[in-house]
Every structure is written in C-alpha cells, then in structure tokens.
Amino acid sequence: MQIQVHTLSRIAASVLLASVAAHASAAGTVVLDTYPLGQDPFGWPSRVFADDSGRQDIAVPFTLTSATSVQSILTSLDGLGGVTLGILASQGSTPVGGAWLYSTHLTDPVMDTTLSPTGWSLGAGTYWLAAVADTGFAGQWQSGTEDYSGDWAQADANGWSAVTSTFIGMPAARITVAAAVAVPEPGTYALMLAGGLLVAALARRKSNARQQG
C-alpha cells in the first residue's frame, strides 16, 4: 500500500507540474531585429545630431499584431550628449513627430546597450522606434548590414521623411515584447482536473490512515 501511495504521489506531482507549465507565459517575442548574426553591426553609420548647422534624427518601424508591452530594446545608437529614444505613432510612411507614446532620455549612449523599459504597453499596429537628438548631441545609429531590409525614416528641421534607398541597411535595432500567455488545450484542462481529484483523494487517504492509526 505504501508503494501505491508513493506512485500516486509522483503521478499527481507530474500532473500538477504540467498544469503549471501550461499556465506559464512564454519567453518574449522579437518583433524587430535588424542586427546581423553575431550582433556586430557593420553597415553605414547614419548620423544623429543637433547643432548650429542643423539636425538629423532617425527612426525604424515595427509592427505589432496584438496588444502587448515592450520588454527590451537593443540598438547600435552611440554618441556624446543627450538623446531621447522612444516610441512614436505612425502616419503613412513616417513617424508622427513631437508626440512620444513612451520615451527615455539617454546621456552618452553606448552601442549595443540593452534597455528594459517598464509600462510601455502598446496596442496592435505600426510604430516607430526613434532617436531624437538634444542640441549638442553628436552620434550615430549604425545600420545592421549593408543589405536593404526595409524603409526607415530620418528627420531634419522640417520634419520626418522616408528613407527608401536600397543601398543602405536599416539601423540596427532589436525589440522584444511580452509573449501571450499560453492557453491550455482541452486535454490539458482534463489533466489538470484529474490531477486535482487525485490530490484530493491522496489527502483523504492520508487523513483516514492517521485516524485508523
């Protein structure tokens, strides 16, 4: 009898672990990745700057198929001074300027540094990850490769415009968002119910054994 109880306990534990795994959220989902293999950008470095001669800001688009939140952002942005990195809404082939959905201010950003924002929740749609220079910032956002991987955008004092050249790769960026929680299949629900009943039966059996002892 003792062996049978131990066997049932192991079965119950296995079923419960399976139910927990079914409810666990999956790892984050990458929705934009313009980095090359090995995460070492080697494409054209596009300037990000603002000084007396003018300015240039850079943005890359990404699309979400469902509501989610941003887990991490990796870019090749690098430079000296202050710059704002954040999310802008989309209007046609360019970002909507001047209205940050979310942003963070960086000082002397270093290439390939990961940011982990909190509370950056977005609905389904197309957005832009943008770097907008403070006055005096001098830096660059290097393309991941020299191969065309899609249009992006740049801005001067007159606003945003699309970059459609097939000779320049998109600036390197990787955006990871929270994945949807896995929904158990009907068979998994049955296993969870069976596991719960089995645990209850084991508890009753142990209670009866103590009372008889």
Predicted regions span which residues?
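N-terminal secretory signal peptides that target proteins for export/translocation
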Residues: M1-H6, R210-G213
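Gram-negative bacterial Sec-dependent N-terminal signal peptides
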Residues: Q4-A24
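PGST-rich, cysteine-poor low-complexity/disordered linker and tail segments that act as flexible spacers
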Residues: A27-Q39, S46-R47, Q56-V60, L80, ...
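Short beta-strands within extracellular/lumenal beta-sheet-rich domains
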Residues: D52-L64, D112-L115
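Extended extracellular/luminal ectodomain segments enriched in beta-structured repeat modules
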Residues: T65-S72
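Aromatic- and Gly/Pro-enriched, solvent-exposed loop/edge beta-strand patches characteristic
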Residues: S76-N158
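A short, hydrophobic C-terminal helix/tail in secreted or cell-surface proteins
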Residues: P184-A203
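C-terminal membrane-anchoring or membrane-association module
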Residues: A200-G213
